[in-house]
Amino acid sequence: MATRRAFEILSQELTIEDKEKSERAKSIFSPALLQRLKDARKELDPKIQIDISIPQVYDANIKDIWITLGSPRAFDNNRQYELMQWMTLTIGVKAARQTDEEEKFSNYRGRVAKGLMDGAHFKVDVEIDADVEYKVSKPKSPDGNNDSVLMYDRGRRPLIISFETPYFEPADRMVAGRDEDDEPIMDWSWRIADIDQLLAKEALDERKAK
């Protein structure tokens, strides 16, 4: 239900300039995804209306969970850090001052342990089986005639939606505190970071081009 509502808000954001609705969209979608969709929107006639909806969701399954640990500065081609990657886990740690042969194991372990606590970010790819509806139309004319549909498509298909957390720096900021039952208090929300791996594919193409 929340995802269906998110697409309604996205449609409004891409069609109507409204400060309140814009703030709502920013709280639901990541800045990178929202900007990418807005850039694509600018290439179209500003008068057209865009409606993206998910009338029915039949099933949903977690596809992948991506975990990133370490300072976010480690992922900016920073030579002061080194990256360790395994499957969907990436860890950024301070680079060693010594070679692998010279560094003591205790120093290596301490370096990695500190890196784990410097920051944390989680992304979950969820594949949903749903009816997806797209509609691009011109607004109704002054005489009240029906809007002119320029493009329409509806069909049942798999849709991959990526949800992400904020980047917690340090990692323990993920938990704001504890309630009276000692349960963790979370003062953050998941955001939609990608749709059908749009940004992920573009990032991969960009890396291949280098």
Where are these regions (language model features)?
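Core segments of small alpha/beta cavity-forming domains
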Residues: 1-88
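Compact beta-sheet-dominated globular domain cores
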Residues: 107-210
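Context-gated lysine
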Residues: 19-21, 26, 38, 42, ...
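Generic serine detector
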Residues: 11, 22, 27-30, 53, ...
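A short hydrophobic beta-strand element
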Residues: 56-140
